[in-house]
Amino acid sequence: NKIRTYSVIVHEYFHVYQRALSHDKILDRNSPKWLFEGGAKVLEEIYLKQYYKKYLLKNDLKQSDNWSIKRVSKEPKLYEKYNTSPQKKGFDNNYSGSAFIVLALVNELKKNNISEEKAFELVFREFWIQRGKQPQGWNWQPSFQNTFGMTVPEFYERLSKYKRKDLKKIL
C-alpha cells in the first residue's frame, strides 16, 4: 500500500543519511545494528504517526509471540550484528528489538535531564557524526560514550532492568 511504500522510503533514506554522517563507517559493519536499524525504524514510525496517524511499532512491540523483551533486555549484544539477531517464528525482529533498544536509550537519556528532542537528535544525528570521526574499523563504543555520556556496558545494565510493563514508558 501507499503508506507502507512511503514509510519504507523514509526508513531507507535515513540509512543514506546515517552513512553520509558517518562517512560510510556503517559499511564496515563495526557499528551496532540495533542503532542503525532501530534508529531507522523509530524515524519511520515517527513519520507514520505524524502524517498518517498510524503507529505500527506499538502493535509490533505488544506482540510477545514475535519477539522477546527478556532477550532484548538481557542479551542486547545479540542485536549488535545482523547474523546474531534472534528470529522468532520466522519473524526477523531486527526492527522490533532494535527499535525497542533505541527507545530505551532515549528514555535513559531523558532520565539524565536531556529533553526528548535532544535525545532523538543524539540518536539520529550526533552519534553518526562521532562515528564518522573515528578511523575505519574503529570500535563504535567510544563514539557511543562520547555522544550519550555513558558506556555501552552501563547502558546495557540499565536496559537489563526493562520489563514488558515498561513499554508504556517508552512508547
What do the PLM-derived regions correspond to, one by one?
Residues 1-69:
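Zinc-dependent metallopeptidase catalytic helix centered on the HExxH motif
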